[in-house]
Amino acid sequence: MEKLSFEEGKFAVKFARINIECYLSGVHYVVDDLPPIFKKPRGVFTTLYTYPKRNLRGCIGIPEPVMPLIDALKEASISASVDDPRFPPVGRMELRDITIEISILTPPKLVEANSPADYLEKIKVGRDGLIIEYGTYRGLLLPQVPIEHNWDIGEYLANLCLKAGLPVDTWIKKKVNIYSFESQIFKELSPNGKIVEEK
């Protein structure tokens, strides 16, 4: 899948910030000059962190490439700021103390596994984001999450189950579907400051 250039990644982060600012101010934000890649369907997540402590402040996204990237980014950035049920809505003035991180996702692919041990072999911490499905339960963790928490593969899978509202050993004891994806990450180092691509 075609990756974003660094300039396109910067555009995504800046767009997300302005989009949130406009939404919180009651202003409709429209972009006229759009890089072509933003018209292609992509999955995307917007993650907000407090600055400088870098505590999670909101994270919502659209994992599947079901709409043009610009539309997914518009929806995810607003949702991360006001619709994450774990946090109160972000205030307009508070946004000055928040950094924005954008993850552009590859389409999720089913991890083929004949036994739970196969997951330990096929999933790579730091490369793979994961989605687990079991019945009506579904949970997702971005690839940067286990790195931030220093999890090994077993801890990663256990926490993936917890994210879905399942017991930690569901991936071992039940017939689940686990999907993997990769992400290209662009983030601010400080609020409205320098933007970098995370390698």
From Swiss-Prot:
Residue ranges constituting the AMMECR1 domain according to the UniProt record: 7-197
Transmembrane segments: none
PANTHER family, per database record: AMME SYNDROME CANDIDATE GENE 1 PROTEIN, AMMECR1 HOMOLOG
Name of the protein this chain belongs to: Protein Maeo_0138
Protein species of origin: Methanococcus aeolicus (strain ATCC BAA-1280 / DSM 17508 / OCM 812 / Nankai-3)
